[in-house]
Swiss-Prot record:
The keyword Zinc does not apply. It comes from Dictyostelium discoideum (Social amoeba). Signal peptide: none annotated. This is RUS family member 1. Glycans are attached at residues 21, 243, 346, 467, 497. Disruption phenotype: No visible phenotype. The lineage of its organism: Eukaryota, Amoebozoa, Evosea, Eumycetozoa, Dictyostelia. One of its GO terms (cellular component) is membrane.
Length: 527
């Protein structure tokens, strides 16, 4: 229970304080007496709101967390609805698989022995335990960040395991044990993946630190669904007996298996996780690029997610690899120099064309003047000749001066470019040194360092903000740029800069950012 503030409300012209529970339902009313009365008499109990004892409210109290729907996230009902249906289908198919396994053990066969059945049962259980341990060792760290994917994969493996159990009695006794072991291994992996991801999803649904309550009510829902599934399984088993054809049995199994996969997909798709893994980060940046800098919400990204087949190689690269930062900078500088050189060549060509046109026009004008002035006196001819000579001399002098100035400018530009290259290279080396010494950054795959050599594969996607204003300014242009281009392109590659407000906007949209590696002043974004 909680008190919904201390505001007073007027009900039937009586000042009172209303007490509400977590589901925002009124449970008690207290009359507010005069402030001049004694302290003990200021609050008078007015009435208690009796709870509705209807069947619907009883079901809500039995199977829904306390305070529903305010105590859980908005996607809770959609997930639980489809998850309950898929659990029902799984119970029915599990009954058919168990029936096939018992038949393979020799139930109903007078020649079968108890010792043989016990030995086979123990071997199956042992193989399942080994498969559970190996899977937890290999994929345990991936279950948290890809909980939706593994939640759906777990049910696929469960169906594969039951399919192997269904076909195992159809073969000889020598193949029954290996096929049934494969089926149990798949179901054991489903138990690990499904159980771990279920815990992760339950933590997501628990909105008010009510993880235990949400988990307990989820267990109650699952138990009730299993009871209903057992009743339906008894009905299905009564129609499917030893005299039923194999085709009918498999049609029933495939129908409930398909329905199980469909409902499970709808359940996982309804979940709107707010944590950011590598795949969801790719979708966020892709949405950011193609929607003019707008930030997507968790519900929008949930609609774009491919649950089962996530991309393996990302065509958007955030920043540059730590090992390739120097090489990428050199390639970028070469592209810039090529672009500037091409621009200077075009400008020089246009200037030369203009100068040639001007000289041709001057020559034509001089010829016309000479033809028109043939009948003039000798003094005018001498003056024209002298003027032409002086003009040519001056033009030559000006051209030489212009050429010298252009050469000087080109030399200055080359010197400036060389100085910039040297400065950039020094900055790049300083960045690498500071990043190697710092621990305030996170990488997508793992923290791995063999000796003093940083492995390139461990720095595939990195977003960092280190301590110190100098370091921040130095690395900002490298790690806060989304580069979606190929370096072999002749054109200057486009970039979209992401400032520090980008991550604040992510938080405003409801995304949860992992800040476990926070330092005193810097902060880190990642998974």
């Amino acid at each position: 229970m909680q008190y919904n503030g201390k505001s007073q409300q007027s009900i039937n012209k009586i000042n009172c304080i209303i007490e509400k529970n977590q589901s925002n339902s009124i449970i008690n009313k207290f009359q507010v007496a005069s402030p001049y009365d004694d302290y003990d008499d200021r609050l008078n109990f007015l009435e208690t709101i009796e709870k509705n004892s209807g069947f619907y409210n009883v079901l809500c109290e039995l199977f829904l967390p306390n305070g529903y729907p305010d105590s859980v996230t908005t996607d809770y009902f959609g997930y639980q609805f489809w998850d309950s249906i898929q659990a029902l289908c799984s119970t029915i198919t599990g009954t058919l698989a168990t029936r096939a396994i018992l038949k393979g053990y020799g139930v109903g066969d007078s020649s079968a022995t108890v010792a043989s059945a016990t030995t086979q049962w123990l071997i199956r259980d042992g193989m399942g335990m080994i498969g559970r341990i190996v899977f937890a060792w290999r994929k345990g760290t991936d279950l948290d960040c890809n909980s939706k994917k593994w939640r759906y994969t777990a049910d696929i493996l469960n169906n594969i395991g039951m399919a192997f159990e269904m076909i195992s009695p159809l073969f000889s006794s020598q193949l029954f044990l290996p096929l049934s072991c494969i089926g149990l291994i798949a179901k054991s992996i489903c138990g690990v993946a499904g159980g771990c991801t279920k815990a992760s999803l339950t933590q997501h649904f628990a909105k008010r630190d009510n993880l235990a309550d949400v988990s307990a009510k989820d267990g109650s829902q699952e138990t009730a669904v299993n009871l209903v599934g057992m009743l339906l399984s008894v009905i299905v088993s009564s129609f499917i007996n030893d005299n039923t054809s194999l085709i009918v049995t498999w049609l029933v199994f495939l129908f409930f298996t398909s329905l199980h996969l469909f409902c499970n997909y709808r359940a996982v798709s309804a979940v709107q996780l707010k944590s950011i893994n590598r795949y969801r980060a790719y979708l966020i940046y892709d949405y950011f690029i193609h929607n003019q800098g707008s930030i997507p919400s968790p519900s929008e990204i949930s609609k774009l997610e491919n649950i089962l087949f996530s991309i393996k190689e990302l065509d958007i690269r955030v920043g540059v690899s730590l090992c390739n930062i120097y090489k990428v900078q050199q390639k970028q500088q070469k592209l810039n120099n090529q672009f500037l050189q091409q621009k200077l060549n075009n400008i020089t060509k246009t200037k030369n064309v203009n100068n040639n046109n001007n000289n041709n026009n001057n020559n034509n004008n001089n010829n016309n003047n000479n033809n028109n002035n043939k009948n003039n006196n000798i003094n005018n001819i001498n003056n024209n000749i002298n003027n032409n000579i002086n003009n040519n001399i001056n033009n030559n002098i000006n051209n030489k001066n212009n050429n010298n100035n252009n050469n000087n400018n080109n030399n200055n530009n080359n010197n400036n470019n060389n100085n910039n290259n040297n400065n950039n290279n020094k900055n790049s080396l300083e960045i690498i040194k500071k990043i190697k010494k710092s621990k305030s950054f996170i990488i997508w795959k793992k923290h791995s360092q063999r000796g003093n050599k940083i492995l390139e594969k461990d720095f595939t996607l990195l977003i960092a903000l280190l301590n110190g204003s100098t370091t921040r300014d130095m690395i900002e242009s490298y790690f806060y740029a989304v580069e979606y281009f190929h370096l072999s392109s002749v054109q200057i590659p486009p970039t979209i800069n992401i400032s520090g407000t980008f991550f604040k906007r992510l938080e405003e949209k409801g995304w949860d950012l992992d800040r476990a590696l926070l330092n005193s002043e810097g902060w880190t974004f990642g998974i």
